[in-house]
């Protein structure tokens, strides 16, 4: 059971199976950047100056992708007005899905997957956190295009970056064989120590 809040034109559907359907995850308790962010005002909505927030940057990155569907945004009741206002300020539409209770990443993705599946046969989802800072949008778009090609072939795709050294705050992906130049098989995920 989930709550669904739709802030946009309901005539839109997920008819095109080849189209990517972005899911922006807006969970989190806002404790990492305290006192700037807090439970009622998490870091993805903190003003970075010049009409920028991490959430707006994510929305604008989504808008820069070709052949993209209307994004699903998963958030809780407390943050839905921040999401709605930010979408309006960016000139974007979005489907806002309200989590009945915060349960971390996997249930939030499942919520969006069920909502997307209700509107289309087998949609390809692009799962994005709302609080990442990415500098190179062109490189991001190229990576998404390669990932979409792999997903259309039936692969589940995750993004990774080459680390510049060991970090205890991050897990690692053990890379396997190449998949035609667009990616690699995953041998295993190594959880953070």
Kindly label every feature range from the protein language model.
Residues 43-44, 171:
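Extracytoplasmic/periplasmic beta-strand context in beta-sandwich domains
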């Amino acid at each position: 059971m989930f709550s669904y809040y739709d802030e946009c034109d309901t005539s839109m559907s997920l008819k095109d199976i080849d189209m990517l359907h972005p899911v922006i995850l807006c969970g989190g308790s806002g404790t990492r950047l305290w006192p700037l962010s807090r439970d009622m005002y998490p870091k993805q909505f903190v003003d970075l100056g010049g009409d920028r927030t991490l959430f707006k940057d994510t929305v604008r990155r989504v808008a820069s992708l070709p052949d993209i569907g209307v994004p699903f945004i998963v958030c809780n009741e407390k943050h839905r007005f921040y999401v709605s206002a930010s979408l309006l300020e960016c000139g974007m539409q979005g489907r806002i899905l309200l989590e009945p209770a915060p349960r971390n990443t996997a249930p939030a993705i499942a919520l969006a997957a069920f909502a997307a599946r209700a509107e289309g046969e087998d949609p390809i989802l692009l799962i994005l956190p709302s609080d990442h800072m990415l500098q190179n949008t062109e490189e991001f778009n190229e990576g998404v295009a390669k990932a979409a090609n792999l997903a259309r072939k039936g692969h589940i795709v995750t993004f990774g970056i080459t680390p510049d050294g060991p970090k205890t705050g991050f897990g690692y992906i053990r890379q396997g064989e190449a998949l035609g130049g667009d990616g690699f098989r995953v041998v295993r995920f190594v959880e953070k120590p």
